[in-house]
């Protein structure tokens, strides 16, 4: 029958402060995170952004203990999943593959090959699909498969998303219910679903299903909760000058306060593990914002981590994937068109060779301007918060 494996995919995070800059470099080197008109600009821009943002990011990681807990928690999830599968009589090895830090996806693939895995379930730890998260990891894996005959011999299947799994939504509702019950009148507390944002162009131009899956997930959690609480959905972690999915978390919180909301429970809907976006951005930045706006009671639902219902549902998901038809990389959602993650022009790029030459010259001037801004610490990118 052969050996069976599960590859858990995640973002990755710096284990210590010294890892922050190279982690950011890896992140911004990914064209699914920042798309540029010229690919040769990707690495220089990644170096600029990682160098200029490293100190601020290190300060944020210092506030949560000096590094991201994501690797530790993901490894705990992997061990819990493997143990639950074993309790069902399944001898399945679980591997961890991070996109931007150790253990890298390539390291996991090397272990999978060495262990002689013949059947593989590829399971991203992102409940909702986006071309910038699961899609980026799938693109990397597809490239590895195309270049490696040994990988091509593995019977694999991918799971694009699982936001509508009953065990997942029930586990989220259970944690939410526990937080609501800390209030004197639980049914009157406003529930604030905060999801990681993506550029609007991903959804409107590239066909990313992320927004629809986030909205569907919110509805399913409220259905599982079965309480009459008012609730809102917003998007956090926006960077750069382009428009992202709205409404923005940092704008909605003061709006709620101005409407008289005094009690708020935040649900990190797109995060299944504690990391910088929950521990620092929500717990510190948004809590302070809420208190300054007049919201006196602010609580946050913890991430699922190794919640028993969640792990049991992941285990069942793996077994269903093994029993069903295989799903290949070319069956996963892909961008419908090339999307540039910078302010869009009203005219098309590269209509003539002369235009291409001018585009190249403008790009070089832009790169020199970036270098000048890095040296002086002043410029438009600082004003919009990209640097």
Curated annotation (Swiss-Prot):
| Top enzyme class | lyase
The listed locations are: Cytoplasm
Query: Part of which pathway?
Result: Porphyrin-containing compound metabolism; protoheme biosynthesis; protoheme from protoporphyrin-IX: step 1/1
Q: Which InterPro entries match?
A: Ferrochelatase, Ferrochelatase_AS, Ferrochelatase_C, Ferrochelatase_N
Among the entry's GO cellular component annotations, what is one?
cytoplasm
- Its domain of life reads Bacteria
Could you list this entry's UniProt keywords, alphabetically sorted: Cytoplasm, Heme biosynthesis, Iron, Lyase, Metal-binding, Porphyrin biosynthesis
Q: Which GO terms describe its biological process?
A: heme biosynthetic process
Q: Molecular function terms in GO for this entry? A: ferrochelatase activity; metal ion binding
Q: Which Pfam families match?
A: Ferrochelatase (PF00762)
Reaction it catalyzes: heme b + 2 H(+) = protoporphyrin IX + Fe(2+)
Kindly list the positions annotated as binding Fe cation.
196, 277
Where is the major localization of this protein?
A: cytoplasm
EC number of this enzyme:
4.98.1.1
Respond yes or no to whether keyword Cytoplasm is given for this record: yes
PANTHER family, alphabetized: FERROCHELATASE, FERROCHELATASE, MITOCHONDRIAL
| Family that this chain belongs to | Belongs to the ferrochelatase family.
| The protein's role, per its UniProt record | Catalyzes the ferrous insertion into protoporphyrin IX.
What protein is this chain from? Ferrochelatase
The species this protein belongs to is Cyanothece sp. (strain PCC 7425 / ATCC 29141)
Which gene does this sequence derive from?
hemH
């Amino acid at each position: 029958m052969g050996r069976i494996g599960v590859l858990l995919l995640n973002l990755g995070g710096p284990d210590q402060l010294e890892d922050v800059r190279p982690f950011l470099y890896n992140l911004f080197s990914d064209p699914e995170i920042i798309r540029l008109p010229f690919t040769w600009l990707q690495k220089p821009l990644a170096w600029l952004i990682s160098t200029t943002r490293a100190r601020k990011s290190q300060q944020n990681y210092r506030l949560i203990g000096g590094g991201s807990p994501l690797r530790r928690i993901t490894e705990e999830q992997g061990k819990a999943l493997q143990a639950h599968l074993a309790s069902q009589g399944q001898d399945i090895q679980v591997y961890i593959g991070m996109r931007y830090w150790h253990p890298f996806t390539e390291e996991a693939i090397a272990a999978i090959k060495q262990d002689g895995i013949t059947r593989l379930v590829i399971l991203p730890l992102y409940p909702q699909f986006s071309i910038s998260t699961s899609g980026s990891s799938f693109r990397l894996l597809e490239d590895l498969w195309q270049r490696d005959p040994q990988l091509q011999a593995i019977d694999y299947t991918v799971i694009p998303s699982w936001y509508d799994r009953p065990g997942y939504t029930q586990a989220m509702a259970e944690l939410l219910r526990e937080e609501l019950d800390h209030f004197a009148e639980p049914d009157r507390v406003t529930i604030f679903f905060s999801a990681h944002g993506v550029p609007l162009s991903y959804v409107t131009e590239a066909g990313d299903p992320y927004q629809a899956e986030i909205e569907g997930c919110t509805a399913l959690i409220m259905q599982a909760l079965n309480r009459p609480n008012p609730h809102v959905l917003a998007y956090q972690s926006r960077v750069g000058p382009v428009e992202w999915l709205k409404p923005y978390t940092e704008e909605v919180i003061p709006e709620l306060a101005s409407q008289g909301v005094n009690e708020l429970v935040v649900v990190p809907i797109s995060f299944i593990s504690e990391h910088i976006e929950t521990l620092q951005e929500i717990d510190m930045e948004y809590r302070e914002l809420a208190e300054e706006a007049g919201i006196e009671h602010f609580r946050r639902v913890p991430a699922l981590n190794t919640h028993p219902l969640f792990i049991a549902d992941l285990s069942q998901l793996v077994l269903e994937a093994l029993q069903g038809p295989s799903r290949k990389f070319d069956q996963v959602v892909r961008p419908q068109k090339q999307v540039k993650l910078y302010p869009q022009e009203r005219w098309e790029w590269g209509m003539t060779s002369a235009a291409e030459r001018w585009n190249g010259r403008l790009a070089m001037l832009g790169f020199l301007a970036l270098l000048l801004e890095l040296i002086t610490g002043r410029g438009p990118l600082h004003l919009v918060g990209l640097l």
